Structures are given as structure tokens and as C-alpha cells.
Amino acid sequence: IFDSCGYLLEKGHGESLFGRVFEQTEFRREDIILQSKCGIVPGVMYDFSKEHILQSVEESLRRLRTDYLDILLLHRPDALMEPEEVAEAFDLLEGSGKVRHFGVSNHTPMQIQLLKKCVRQDLLVNQLQFSIPFSNMVASGLEANMLTDGAVNRDNSVLDFCRLHDMTIQAWSPFQYGFFEGGICLTVRNIRN
């Protein structure tokens, strides 16, 4: 899976680079899975409007130099989204062949349920921050019925929910850039001193 994350690297520059490299190599499009995201708008926060979703996909396709995405994720929850608008956008994208599968990123079980109320496509993925320092979704299940801090369920049982609903959990930042290189440890040590 190549997750281009659309707009985060200098307004799509990463997708443009990938598109150029893809065009200059012997990759066959059907041999790779291309995934992108939409929803985060710098300066505005989030936008899951039909118009924004459709525009984001068009821009990603243009930059990636392809005619379809295998997976489109709604990036971070838009607490004020209209699930009906998301459903309309997904129907148009699927119907036109521009997106084959859909998912979410960083959504809670209730946010997913709200989407499922209107969206008829399966949401196949929930991309979550998951790594050694961010493993609470597993730890809280291991410490059930205990008084430890790890027993506090801060994610609304998202791991169990995804497993019950056959949603793949994709880990984002699994190596937690900077954490294991010492940068964060040095910062913490400097704060303590």
C-alpha cells in the first residue's frame, strides 16, 4: 500500500513526486494499492463536505497521474460532518470508478457508526496512531478491571469495534519518528533538568 496522504506534504508535492516516479518506472497500476486521504484543510481544520471530498479526489488523481484510487480515507474526524453529504460523495466516486474502497482515519466507534448510518459502502480501514509508545488501544484491554492508568479506556474500545466490524487497523507512524532517535528523550530530560 502506498499511502500518499494527499495534501500534507507541501500541498500535494508528495503525490506529484510519486506520480512522476510511477510514470517513469515499469510498475503496473494494478500491481499496487494507492491510498489517499481527504478532509484536513489547513487553517480551517476539517471539511467532509461533498464538494471538498470530490475536489480532493480529483486533485489526488491528477497529481498521482492515475484514474482511480484503491482506497480513500476520511482523515481525522469532522465532528460537524453531514453523513448524508459523505454518502453522496462516496456514491459518486464509486459509481465513476474513481475510488474502489473507503475507510477512515482516527475515528472512534461512534463516529464510524454515524457515517454507517448513511454510507452504503463498507468502511474497510481505520488508520490509527499505533506504535510502542501509543499502544493504549491494546493495553486498556489487557488491564481490564484494574486500577492502573492503563486500564482507563481513552479510545472507546476502537480496537474491539474494528475487529467486530471487520475493519483493518492501519498503523500510522509505527516507528514514531523522533521518539526512538533520542530527540524526544533529550527534550524530556532537558525539561526535567
What does each of the following model-derived ranges do?
Residues 77, 81-193:
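Beta/alpha (TIM)-barrel catalytic core signal, keyed to glycine-rich beta->alpha loops juxtaposed to Asp/Glu
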Residues 30-42, 127-132:
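A short, structured active-site edge motif that brings together acidic residues
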Residues 61-82:
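Active-site groove signature of glycoside hydrolases
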Residues 4, 36, 169-171:
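Hydrophobic residues in well-ordered beta-strands that form the structural core
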